[in-house]
Structures are given as C-alpha cells and as structure tokens.
C-alpha cells in the first residue's frame, strides 16, 4: 500500500530507513512536540557545502565573489521554496492550527525550512555521499543554467541599485523580533522602502538572511507597481 510518505520519497528520490526522520523533517515548530529546526540547521550547512563544492569544480576560473553570489542564488529561501513546491511539500507538512489557518503550507519560509530539514534528515539516515547525490539531482537544471556575472547579485544589492537608479532613498532595515535559543534563532526584519506602502517583512535564521528575504519581497512588490 502506498502511503503519502512513500509518494513524497519518490518525488525527492530517496527512501528513508528511519521513517521518524522524514516525519520530523516535515514538522513545523507550530505543531506540538518535536519539530524540524535542528534538522534545518544541519541541512542548511550541508546544502551550502555541497553547492560550494560543485561550483568550485564546475567553474575553475571564476573568482570567490562570483562563486559566493551564485551560491547565494542557489541556496536562498526563494530557490528552496521553489524546490518545495516542485515536491508539493505543502501537502505533507505538519503545522499547528494557527499556521494551517493562515496558509503556512504555502509560505516560502516554511517550505524552504522544510527542504533544508529534509536534507539534514537524508544525511542522518545515510551518509555524506548519498546526501550529495540527492542534492545535486535536485539542483541539476539550476546548476547547468547558472552563470557567473551580475545577475547573481544578492537581493539587498539589487534593491539598493533599483532604488538608486530611480533616485529614491535607500531601504531601512530594522530587526523587530528575535526568538529561539542562541544557536537556533529566527530573526524578523522590517524593511521600509520608497514606493511600497507598508514595511516589508523578512524572516531568517540570521539577521542577514532576514534582510535578504525582506529585500527579495520588496523587489517583487516593486516590480508589480
């Protein structure tokens, strides 16, 4: 009999030996009991290493700055959320009542965190080489199409250049909330941007990631104005 998890395992290309790991990876902190944030922490580091290693060997003549920008593009929340939607992760997430009601299963940050948690779970269930193979299979088309150059600028840089080009004031970022233990925090940042009515919210596991997430959202809103 095919369970929902069997279906998800086929989508991600990996069958778990320890089913508890995949269930934990899909459990958001809003749900009761254990949740996926420790797995997310682990998966974030593994993903960054695997992508950095691939870019280093794929682009032997590219400098550190361009490689950093390409990696940032590939591991940012928006890209991870795209992967989550490709796997239809929203159908499998375990959320608390409040997140369910507010549509958390569609939220970029929750989908991105779950993808990182799955990476952490695959690593714990197997080994470094297996998780590398899985990540590279997910990223194959993106790695084949990405190129070094200006298009890889991070969202904060692109937002600043967008505003400067229109002679608008620079964005103002303010940390409005920090929650969680020191090793596992979530930062909430508000970004005030000329041309956007309300401050834009960004969340991330560091201030920098939260600011980048807010800048990405601001760019999307400005492009629709």
From Swiss-Prot:
Residue stretches making up the RNase III domain: 5-127
Cofactor(s) of this protein: Mg(2+)
Reactions it catalyzes: Endonucleolytic cleavage to 5'-phosphomonoester
Entry EC no(s): 3.1.26.3
Subunit structure comment from the entry: Homodimer.
Family membership: Belongs to the ribonuclease III family.
Protein name (database record): Ribonuclease 3
Source organism: Vibrio atlanticus (strain LGP32)
Lineage: Bacteria, Pseudomonadati, Pseudomonadota, Gammaproteobacteria, Vibrionales
């Amino acid at each position: 009999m095919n369970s929902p998890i069997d279906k998800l395992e086929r989508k991600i290309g990996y069958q778990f030996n320890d089913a508890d790991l995949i269930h934990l990876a899909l459990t958001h902190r809003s749900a009761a009991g254990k949740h996926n944030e420790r797995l997310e922490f682990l998966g974030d580091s593994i993903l960054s290493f695997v992508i950095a290693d691939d870019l280093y060997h794929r682009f032997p003549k590219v400098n550190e700055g361009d490689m950093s920008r390409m990696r940032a593009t590939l591991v940012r929340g928006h890209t991870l959320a795209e992967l989550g939607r490709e796997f239809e992760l929203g159908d499998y997430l375990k959320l608390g009542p409040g997140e369910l009601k507010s549509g958390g299963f569609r939220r970029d940050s929750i989908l991105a965190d779950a993808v990182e948690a799955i990476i952490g779970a695959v690593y714990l269930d197997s080994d470094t080489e297996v998780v590398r193979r899985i990540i590279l299979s997910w990223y194959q088309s993106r790695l084949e199409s990405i190129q070094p150059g200006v298009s890889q600028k991070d969202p904060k840089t692109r937002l600043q250049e967008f505003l400067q080009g229109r002679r608008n004031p620079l964005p103002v970022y303010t940390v409005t909330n920090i929650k969680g233990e020191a090793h596992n925090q979530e930062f909430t940042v508000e970004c005030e941007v000329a041309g956007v009515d309300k401050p834009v919210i960004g969340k991330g596991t560091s201030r920098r990631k939260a600011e980048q997430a807010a800048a990405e959202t601001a760019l999307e809103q400005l492009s629709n104005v």
